[in-house]
Amino acid sequence: MAISMRGRAVEEANRQHAARIVFHTEIRYSPDMKTRFARFSSLLFLLGSLTGLAAANPPFTGGRWIDLTHEFSSETLYWPTAERFTLETEFHGQTPKGYFYAANRYRASEHGGTHIDAPIHFAEGHKTVDQLPIDQLTGAAVVVDVSARAQKDADYQITVADLKAWEERHLQIPNGAIVLFRTGFARHWPDAKKYLGTDEKGTDAVAKLHFPGLHPDAARWLVSERTIKAVGLDTASIDYGQSTLFESHRILFEKNIPAFENVAALDQLPATGAYIIALPMKIKGGSGGPLRIVAWVAEKP
């Protein structure tokens, strides 16, 4: 009984559908009606597109940007053997044709101020700064705060225990994270003696450098136990000031993991939840370069 009724219902539906097809095929549109229909269809498409744009959520709303970059000037700190930043005026003023014009030239070593170390810096045959993909320079960040220890010991080296303790308080460092280390030394910028341990210049000054860095064992743990995009910290080098072998650089760079150095304002970032955009000057074949690094931090609900 139920099967018979269902069959009749299907037949009736098919009959009505066929009738609608016949009705529509018999309609004849005048040229004027076709024009109006085309215009109406275009209007519907435009309205639909605008509605879609309005409904789409624009990126980076409901939060704030934090600039993690020290400005470049005559006060910018560099390695004792590196050429410092200089800005020279090429022209500044009114031109003979009556309009204002300004242009400068600058000189500096790649590695100074807020900058990036590309893997080629300590790993032969590895990526130069222009070869680093944008995806590797952007992403979610975790901030490991060792400022309490670094305040007591200028030669402090961040350990595997520090990383594991951070994970116990928060979560496992996610795959694809950018790992930032806050030592608190950014508060000394641009006082060279406090930030670097010496304000002297030249080869002899290198032995007098004192600032915190990442212990080679911690660098090795990061590349073997976690999958990260990049590292960064608020001192002049990933390795601590007294390093002579730069092992942490070598361990990270052998895996094509770049480093951000002399990062500012890490005290303004949460332990988790910040999104980093770190874009260096795209120097072909460069071992590093000036870096503009910013963080997006969403507002707490």
Annotate each predicted stretch with a short phrase:
Residues S30-L43:
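Bacterial N-terminal signal peptides that target proteins for export
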Residues A55-P301:
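Active-/binding-site microenvironments in catalytic and ligand-binding cores
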